[in-house]
Amino acid sequence: MNTILRTLLFEWKDRKLPSIIERDIRLDTSSQQKINNATVITGFRRVGKTYMLYDAIKKLFETQTREEVVYINFEDERIIAPTTDLLTNLIPEIQAIYGQKPKYLFLDELQLIPYWSKWVRRMLDTESLQIFITGSSSKMSSAELPTELRGRAWEIKVTPLTLKNFYALKM
């Protein structure tokens, strides 16, 4: 599993971000209040949760380096039968590859990893970083947010495009 994790981290170093359509809602990555709290982005499939992460990452790249901002998509087909070890090794692998710990972690579809919420809680308690998580609303909502994260996570619900966004896309 470490080989896959290393591959994903090396690929991230050179990955180009896709074009992004601005939405009415954007992630706030500047607030120091978010350290020791996670931001959980939920919504139906294909409503733009991942692109919301990309938008925030693109904005962060104006002041931060790739080594400080790390994105991992846990829906990657190379992550087969994931275990908690994948998460346990994440920060040490990032540090080994990039030479430093990240300031921002963007974890797409994290709910696919067993015991993910316990790991996030440990990171919030022991590391100084901002964590952004996406998950489909059928698997991760405020009503179903694990008890480990209650009071430690802000939820942002993403809805389908507004009519204004839709027209902007078509223009």
Where in the sequence are the language-model features?
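Phosphate-binding site recognition
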Residues: 1-171
